[in-house]
């Protein structure tokens, strides 16, 4: 499979700032996103690997962070979607990037959906 082959249309990307839960160092992860009302939604797919990505594991101890979309830097609070929220939201990123469904089929873990709420 060719990565990126699942794009059905141009997909917006953002930069997510996250602080290491171990070292305290700051990092930036480029991620695909969709919007849901005033919220920004990202998916911790890690391309279907067995473990969640580092950026995702860094968010629970440090949920207040920033994202950058274009030149717009925004403060957000990262919240993992509940099972009901995930069920409602999951089809939307899959519609934007079909490979998310493939990634889910490659792993036994439920791929988390993260809601980035303005703060």
Swiss-Prot record:
Keyword Translocase: no
Catalytic activity, reaction form: oxidized coenzyme F420-(gamma-L-Glu)(n) + a quinol + H(+) = reduced coenzyme F420-(gamma-L-Glu)(n) + a quinone
Name of one Pfam family that matches: F420H2_quin_red
Class of this enzyme: oxidoreductase
GO molecular function terms listed in the Swiss-Prot or TrEMBL record: coenzyme F420 binding; oxidoreductase activity
EC code: 1.1.98.-
Binding site for coenzyme F420-(gamma-Glu)n: 21-23, 27-32, 43-46, 54-58
Any one GO CC term of the record: plasma membrane
UniProt membrane topology term: Peripheral membrane protein
Chief location of this protein within or outside the cell: membrane
Record's function text: Involved in a F420-dependent anti-oxidant mechanism that protects M.tuberculosis against oxidative stress and bactericidal agents. Catalyzes the F420H(2)-dependent two-electron reduction of quinones to dihydroquinones, thereby preventing the formation of cytotoxic semiquinones obtained by the one-electron reduction pathway. Since menaquinone is the sole quinone electron carrier in the respiratory chain in M.tuberculosis, the physiological electron acceptor for Fqr-mediated F420H(2) oxidation is therefore likely to be the endogenous menaquinone found in the membrane fraction of M.tuberculosis.
Family classification: Belongs to the F420H(2)-dependent quinone reductase family.
Protein name per its UniProtKB record: Putative F420H(2)-dependent quinone reductase Rv3178
UniProt organism field: Mycobacterium tuberculosis (strain ATCC 25618 / H37Rv)
